[in-house]
């Protein structure tokens, strides 16, 4: 909604990361060396800053790898987690763990950036909460990252973000906070709000009650 500038043609960090992970897994099946070369080329863009046409920026002094090379930065959590896992694939294949370590430092040292009242995740930089689908994805990806790093800050965050399962009141609180934050930060007029309500409120409430 006009809060960032994304200049075409632009590079998607998530697409680069998923492509690299796919190439590495395909290489394990057929041992074709050209696939690892493609994977490394896909990840090379993360060595360059957004200003230089790449996907690297900083968050509170730590390197951060973006899903979208925007100005200002979006800091989308799930995108950065997928990127970190692609860097882990790079490490397994080549032994080079510099990008993986750098991305983990950026995420773990800033994990409270995406933490809403120790109960839920923010989607990214602009003040609105993750949908329930993205929140569950964020939690699942953090579980994978914890299994790889054994970082207790990640473990504590996961445990906090799962606590909503235990309380109907917490589910109701998140339900209200989610729609308030999304309505406040992403919707520009009354018609958009009405469409948003019709499309998502009943579905989200049903999911929260079932979980």
Enumerate the language-model features and the residues they cover.
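Hydrophobic alpha-helical segments and helix pairs
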Residues: 2-45
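Hydrophobic, aromatic-enriched interface-forming segments
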Residues: 42-54, 65-89
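Long, well-ordered core segments of solenoidal/helical folds
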Residues: 1, 36-58, 97-119, 153-176
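Well-ordered alpha-helical segments within folded domains of soluble proteins
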Residues: 10-28, 74-91, 130-147
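Carbohydrate-binding/catalytic loop surfaces
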Residues: 1-11, 56-78, 116-137, 141, ...
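Long alpha-helical, hydrophobic tracts
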Residues: 2, 67-70, 84-90, 94, ...
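Terminal, non-catalytic domain-edge segments
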Residues: 93, 131-211
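Hydrophobic/aromatic-lined pockets within catalytic cores
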Residues: 27-31, 47, 51, 91-95, ...
């Amino acid at each position: 909604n006009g809060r960032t500038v994304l200049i075409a043609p632009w590079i998607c960090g998530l697409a680069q990361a998923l492509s690299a992970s796919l190439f590495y897994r395909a290489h394990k099946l057929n041992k074709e060396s050209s696939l690892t070369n493609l994977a490394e080329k896909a990840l090379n863009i993360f060595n360059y800053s957004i200003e230089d046409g790449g996907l690297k920026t900083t968050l509170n002094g730590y390197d951060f790898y973006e899903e979208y090379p925007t100005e200002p930065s979006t800091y989308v959590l799930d995108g950065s987690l997928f990127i970190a896992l692609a860097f882990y694939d790079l490490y397994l294949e080549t032994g080079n763990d510099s990008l993986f370590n750098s991305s983990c430092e950026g995420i773990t040292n800033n994990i409270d950036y995406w933490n809403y009242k120790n109960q839920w995740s923010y989607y990214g930089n602009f003040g609105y909460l993750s949908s329930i689908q993205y929140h569950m994805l964020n939690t699942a990806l953090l579980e994978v990252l914890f299994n790889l790093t054994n970082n207790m800050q990640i473990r504590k965050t996961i445990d906090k973000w799962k606590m909503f399962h235990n309380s109907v009141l917490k589910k109701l609180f998140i339900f209200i906070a989610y729609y308030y934050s999304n309505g406040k930060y992403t919707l520009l007029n009354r018609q958009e709000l009405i469409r948003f309500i019709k499309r998502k409120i009943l579905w989200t409430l049903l999911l929260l009650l079932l979980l």
